[in-house]
């Protein structure tokens, strides 16, 4: 079936070491050991980007611009090219040629396809050693301390998405001046949040939430 072609399961349990304590954590095979499906990832990312668009950009063409009902000058005898309205796009104050108009950009993606995209990206990150787990994230509201934490774990300069079950205010304050770091909640992260980075850094609570969200409670 389609599901069996896209997903591969292994009997052996996957484990990953914590960066800060070297403790082993078990990863669910049905979340972190899934064969890559680029089409599912592509469709999900495009849908998220499309659905984020307002689609309200608008301009007025010659028929929408107010005024211009009077013929600017007589048809013949002036030597000018004939005109029937002063709101022609050729005139100052006229309409816009081929300007933007409101559009509906919404793109639907099936739930199973989107779930598969999440699992594919997480599995790919684990496979390429771009998925790091820590027991706890920095709790001091100091950027200096946060940078030290990144340096200590050899993460400085990499585009990082930090995932946790709850975004702590102190962590938010410490990281908001670091341009290559973004914070997201495990319960609401998007496909693009996981995809658009060099590395995912996640704490234990975030790992549990992700496993439940995409792999079920068992």
Language model region names:
Residues 3-4, 82:
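Intrinsically disordered, low-complexity regions enriched in polar/acidic and amide residues
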Residues 2-3, 91:
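Short linear sequence motifs
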Residues 2, 8-50, 54, 100-218:
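Extended polybasic, low-complexity segments that bind anionic RNA or targeting/receptor surfaces
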Residues 56-62:
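Short coil/turn segments at secondary-structure boundaries
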Residues 62-98:
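Glycine/serine-rich anion-binding loops at beta->alpha junctions
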């Amino acid at each position: 079936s389609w599901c069996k072609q896209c997903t591969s399961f292994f009997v052996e349990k996957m484990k990953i070491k914590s960066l800060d304590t070297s403790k082993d954590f078990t990863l669910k095979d049905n979340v972190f050991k899934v064969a890559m499906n680029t089409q599912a990832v592509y469709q999900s990312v495009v849908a998220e980007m499309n659905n984020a668009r307002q689609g309200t950009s608008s301009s007025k063409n010659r028929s929408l611009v107010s005024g211009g009902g009077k013929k600017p000058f007589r048809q013949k005898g002036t030597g000018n090219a004939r005109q029937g309205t002063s709101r022609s796009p050729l005139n100052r104050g006229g309409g816009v040629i081929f300007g933007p108009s409101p559009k509906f950009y919404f793109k639907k993606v099936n739930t199973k396809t989107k779930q598969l995209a999440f699992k594919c990206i997480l599995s790919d990150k684990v496979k390429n050693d771009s998925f790091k787990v820590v027991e706890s994230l920095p709790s001091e509201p100091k950027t200096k301390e946060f940078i030290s934490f990144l340096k200590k774990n050899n993460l400085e300069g990499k585009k990082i998405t930090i995932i946790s079950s709850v975004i702590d205010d102190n962590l938010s304050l410490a990281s908001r001046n670091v341009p290559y770091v973004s914070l997201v909640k495990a319960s609401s992260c998007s496909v693009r949040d996981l995809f658009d980075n060099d590395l995912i850094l996640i704490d234990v609570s975030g790992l549990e939430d992700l496993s439940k969200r995409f792999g079920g409670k068992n």
